[in-house]
Amino acid sequence: MAARAVWRRGLTVVTLSVTCVGCGHLGAAQQVPVNPVGVADLKPTQPDPSAGLVAVRRGFDAKKYPAIAIVTFPVTDSGLMNKEEAKLTVTIPAYFQLQIVQRLRATNAFSRVDLVTNGTAAPSGAGLLRLEGRITRLAAGDDTSAWVPFSGYSRLGDRMKAQIETSLVDTRTGQVMAVTADRREAPNSGFQTAESYVEESFQAMARDLVLFLERLAKGEVARSN
């Protein structure tokens, strides 16, 4: 009986460990962005503790801008996509935009955070920033990773890959004041669908981008890791 109890406790520990595989962070792991382009004369090259790679125009003071408008990020990845990935190119832009808006509003870093819907002209004027960008990589990977108790993974599914580039624009002058690039990439653990893994990865990118914007709004300069 004692041996059976020990075996059951061991099985419970293994089950809990398997359940928690990959739960230490949200979505895929952050990676160095691949060949970020930037905008105009700004290219994201400086490592940031949250937003990946960034560049901030000299003299930019975000405290002078009480409002910010968030537009939808189109998917510009021209690679071959399967049916599920094609569906995500339609749903993820609005999902990501909403994640940014909700998280940024919760910080109270700006007195007004506008969500700009597709087909609506982005607001402009003094004291207003516009966050725009594009999703340059979107590959859902798959959820076919196989975990074998006591042995580890016998197979890892194709890697989920997502990369974004953003621009922070002064809407009065049209000048780009800051740019960022972030990338998430990792195989799916197999404990969630490919779609939910992609969504979690974009949640994480929204969270970390907002952390960067919050620091800018407080007048803090971009820091190196």
What residue ranges belong to the model's regions?
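Extracytoplasmic/secreted envelope proteins and their assembly/folding machinery
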Residues: 93, 97, 101, 107, ...
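Sec-exported extracytoplasmic/periplasmic mature domains
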Residues: 100-109, 140, 186, 210-218
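C-terminal motif of bacterial Sec signal peptides marking the signal peptidase cleavage site
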Residues: 20-22
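Short secondary-structure boundary motifs at beta->alpha junctions and helix caps
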Residues: 152-163, 168-215
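Envelope-exposed proteins and targeting segments
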Residues: 64-71, 100, 109, 127-131, ...
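A structural "domain/chain start" motif
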Residues: 24-99, 211-225
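Surface-exposed short loop/turn segments
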Residues: 32-34, 113-175, 192
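Bacterial N-terminal signal peptides that target proteins for export
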Residues: 2-12
